[in-house]
A protein has these predicted regions:
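Non-catalytic terminal/linker segments enriched in charged/polar, low-complexity residues
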Residues: 1-138, 144-145
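NTP-binding/hydrolysis catalytic cores, primarily Walker-type P-loop NTPases
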Residues: 9-12, 21, 78, 87-91, ...
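Hydrophobic anchor at the beta1->P-loop junction of P-loop NTPases
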Residues: 149-151
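Switch II (G3) loop of P-loop NTPases
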Residues: 154-155, 178-189, 196-214, 218-241
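Conserved lysine of the Walker
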Residues: 159
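Hydrophobic positions on the alpha1 helix immediately C-terminal to the Walker A/P-loop
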Residues: 162, 166, 193
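Conserved beta-strand/loop subsegment of P-loop NTPase cores
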Residues: 177-179, 254-261, 278-293, 297-315, ...
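Inter-motif core of Ras-like GTPase G domains
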Residues: 219-227, 240-265
Length: 342
């Protein structure tokens, strides 16, 4: 990471310097007005705008020009300073992965050098927000073309309700042609629940009891924009279920698998679930039940461990309202709320 301080008579000029020296990917850590001695004896101090900005070194431009008081501050490996102890313990106490925490602590000398004093608290919050955003990936808006989405996950994560929310969102907002498919003929009422949604949204519902059935259903509805496939919820420890699931996922080359993870799951159990479902190709995560907890650290840790993209967030039972496309900004805000830093 590079941190630099820029000084200018006006904010617009300071921001222009930031963009020229560090590129459009730079993030502003702090801004303040400072008084500098006049270059001429006896004249009053002059006021300037001071902006401290940061950039990941991979994004830094090759320009040789710098701000008015440049400092590369390339981060060197070092042991945590004694003064960083309280911050280190605060971050570790949240359950964050030690690797991520120690990576943050390594940046503190550079951050403190350029943002010391009253602006340090603001800079630290902005820095954490930026590092969280830099550490995760999101799937982004759905592109054009036929999509076949399979929702998988353990019992109780909300697969059927999430499928209904997605169906309603794409039908009502994007006017997509959608076919619902369920593989869940085991759970009492599962088909009836989906049939209710299908009738309300005026879209077909198909049942596929075997992989060959799923293949035939898709072939019958090739004019559709989107297939949404509900699966049986089983324990991640059920190896037989996972092997059966793998057979369904080979019936069409455009199948995309989305793993649902509940925000109420403990960190260790979440890691175990993801490890067990790694036997199938997962396109993205969907985080559910965000409204049922205030601690999102386990979810963020999972994004750090696997670097899988996040596609959607759900935060309630209402269909279709309680679902949204995941964004880096949203996830960063959720996590900082966990730290009580917002």
């Amino acid at each position: 990471m590079q941190i630099k301080r820029f000084e200018a008579g006006e904010m617009q000029e300071a921001l222009r310097q930031v963009k020229e020296a560090m590129g459009p990917e730079a993030i502003i850590l702090s801004t303040k007005t400072v008084s500098l001695p006049s270059s001429r004896s006896g004249y009053p101090k002059r006021k300037v705008i001071e902006v401290v900005a940061a950039i990941d070194r991979h994004h830094a431009p090759c320009s040789g020009r710098h701000g008015s008081n440049p400092s590369s501050n390339s981060v060197r490996s070092h042991r945590p300073r004694k003064k960083d102890g309280p911050l280190l313990q605060r971050l570790l106490s949240t359950g964050l992965t030690p690797e991520f925490v120690h990576g943050l602590i390594k940046e503190m000398p550079a951050l403190e050098k350029e943002c010391g004093g009253s602006s340090f608290s603001e800079a630290l919050k902005n820095f954490l927000h930026w590092k969280v955003m830099e550490s995760l990936d999101v799937m982004g808006p759905v592109t054009e073309g036929m999509k076949i989405w399979v929702l998988i996950g353990p019992t109780g994560v909300g697969k059927t309700t999430t499928l209904a929310k997605l169906a309603a969102q794409f039908r009502l907002k994007a006017q997509k042609k959608i076919t619902l498919i369920t593989l869940d003929t085991y759970r009492i009422g599962a088909v009836d629940q989906l049939r209710t949604y299908a009738d309300i949204l005026d879209m077909p519902l198909e049942i596929a009891s075997r992989p060959d059935d799923l293949k035939k259903v898709i072939e019958r509805h090739m004019d559709q924009d989107l297939f949404l496939i509900d699966t049986v919820g089983r324990s991640p420890n059920d190896s037989k279920h996972l092997e059966d699931l793998k057979e369904y996922l080979t019936v069409h080359p455009q199948l995309e698998t989305h793993l649902l993870l509940s925000a109420t799951t403990k960190d260790r159990d979440l890691a175990h679930t993801v490890e067990r479902f790694s036997c199938v190709p997962v396109k993205s995560y969907i985080f559910t039940k965000l409204d049922e907890t205030e601690d999102y650290t386990p979810l963020f840790n999972q994004l750090l461990r696997t670097r899988k993209p996040l596609s959607y967030l759900t935060n309630g039972q209402k269909v279709p309202e309680d679902i949204e496309l995941a964004s880096k900004e949203k996830v960063a805000n959720l996590f900082l709320n966990t730290l009580h830093w917002n």
